Every structure is written in structure tokens, then in C-alpha cells.
From Swiss-Prot:
Protein function: Increases viral DNA accumulation. Enhances infectivity and symptom expression.
Gene Ontology biological-process annotations: viral process
Family statement: Belongs to the geminiviridae replication enhancer protein family.
Name by which UniProt lists this protein: Replication enhancer protein
Organism of origin: Pepper huasteco yellow vein virus (PHYVV)
Quaternary structure and interacting proteins, as annotated: Homooligomer. Interacts with the replication-associated protein (REP). Interacts with host proliferating cell nuclear antigen (PCNA). Interacts with host retinoblastoma-related protein 1 (RBR1), and may thereby deregulate the host cell cycle. Oligomerization and interaction with PCNA are necessary for optimal replication enhancement.
InterPro entries in the record: Gemini_AL3 (IPR000657)
Keywords from the UniProt entry: Host-virus interaction
Length: 132
């Protein structure tokens, strides 16, 4: 859903993409928080994937934040190490696909979190398209 207007994003807007070799550093990965809930054997990584300026202009986006909450059973790994692994898997998927779009970023995250040590993934997206 477009955050500014409240209008649902159409399939054409979500599938609109650009070749990945035309963009330098299309995505910016940031770890926002690492939680270790008490009395559990799990760790929660709050990861934000942002579309870089080059990608936003190519796709006609004003703002594109993909927020993910990844619940894992990894208790000994640090946030930065998991972020590097997550980024590597997402970029590996997108490089093999060759096309980057809103749908493909979500599919790449699904690929990166489809591991035995990931219990659940919660998603929240802040996407705003340019109106002018």
C-alpha cells in the first residue's frame, strides 16, 4: 500500500524493475535492533532494507523501506555477522535474477530467510511512489 495516498500498489508497479547491473549499490542494509527474549532460545533481528537513491529514481519511488523482524534460534551470532550473511544471500538472489523490483526484493528476503534456523519473519513496508 502506498503510505502517502493509502492506495494499494498495483501489480504493474510492484513488478516494475530495472536491471541490477545498471545500478550501483541498489540496496542499503541496516540492523536496527537485536533482541534476546528472556527464557527463550531465540534471538530477534530487526533489519531494515532501504532502496538507494539510484534505485528509487529508476523505479519512480519517493521512499522505500522494507522492515523485517527475523526470529532465529541463533543465540551465539552477533547482529553484524547475521546482517552480513543476510545481505550476501539477498544480493546473491538478486544478482542471479538480474532484475530488481519491489517484488523481487521481497522474494530475495524470503530466499535469505528460508533456513532451518529461522522460525518466523514479520514484514512491514513503507513504500511511497512519486506522484509528480
Amino acid at each position: 500500500m502506498d503510505l502517502r495516498t493509502g492506495v494499494p500498489i498495483t501489480a504493474a508497479q510492484a513488478a516494475n524493475g530495472v536491471f541490477i547491473w545498471e545500478l550501483r549499490n541498489p540496496l542499503y542494509f541496516k540492523i536496527r535492533l537485536v533482541e534476546t527474549p528472556m527464557y527463550t532460545r531465540s534471538r530477534v533481528f530487526h533489519i531494515q532494507v532501504r532502496a538507494n537513491h539510484n534505485m528509487r529514481t529508476a523505479l519512480g519511488l519517493h521512499k522505500a523501506y522494507f522492515n523485517f523482524q527475523v526470529w532465529t534460534t541463533l543465540t551465539t551470532i552477533s547482529g553484524q555477522i547475521y546482517l552480513n550473511r543476510f545481505k550476501l544471500l539477498v544480493m546473491f538472489y538478486l544478482d542471479n535474477l538480474g532484475l530488481i523490483s519491489v517484488n523481487n526484493v521481497i522474494r530475495a528476503v524470503s530466499f535469505a530467510t528460508d533456513k532451518r534456523y529461522v522460525n518466523a519473519v514479520l514484514e512491514n513496508h513503507e513504500i511511497i511512489y512519486k506522484l509528480y
